[in-house]
Amino acid sequence: MKKSAVLNEHISKAIATIGHFDLLTINDAGMPIPNDHRRIDLAVTKNLPRFIDVLATVLEEMEIQKIYLAEEIKEHNPTQLQQIKQLISSEIEIIFIPHEEMKSNLAHPLNKGNIRTGETTPYSNIALESNVTF
């Protein structure tokens, strides 16, 4: 049995295929994720699993250099923003973009996976940009 953090085979596969500058998104339950091969639906019920728990687990296995968040999170979900900032290194660049642009990242050619959580707080969506480990 696998010993590392991510046990879900689809998330594990997405992370394994990621190269430098590729993206992986983690989303709340309301994000309109395209129904294609990149969709990884973990939602069981409202707030299960939580966005922040999935993010923390993915960060244990994925080297990132930059994150993208919706500009709207600052006003509409500052608690989630603080939790995200606590999880990531201060060296990681945070880029705030309009929520509509976050939606367009779901179909971006460099995006290797769109994870849907059960999160029901607004603007709990993130795009992780991969870095190299060397």
Curated annotation (Swiss-Prot):
Annotated GO biological process: D-ribose catabolic process
Pathway where this protein functions: Carbohydrate metabolism; D-ribose degradation; D-ribose 5-phosphate from beta-D-ribopyranose: step 1/2
GO cellular component, one term: cytosol
Keyword Cell cycle: no
Coiled coil: none
Positions with a binding annotation for substrate: D28, H99, Y123, S124, N125
SUPFAM superfamilies in the cross-refs: RbsD-like
Enzyme class: isomerase
Keywords: Carbohydrate metabolism, Cytoplasm, Isomerase
EC number: 5.4.99.62
Isomerase is among the record's keywords: yes
GO molecular function (one): intramolecular lyase activity
Top-level taxon of the source organism: Bacteria
Localization: Cytoplasm
Catalytic reaction(s) noted: beta-D-ribopyranose = beta-D-ribofuranose
Gene3D superfamilies associated with the record: RbsD-like domain
Subunit structure: Homodecamer.
Record-linked PANTHER family: D-RIBOSE PYRANASE
Family membership noted in the UniProt record: Belongs to the RbsD / FucU family. RbsD subfamily.
Protein name, UniProt field: D-ribose pyranase
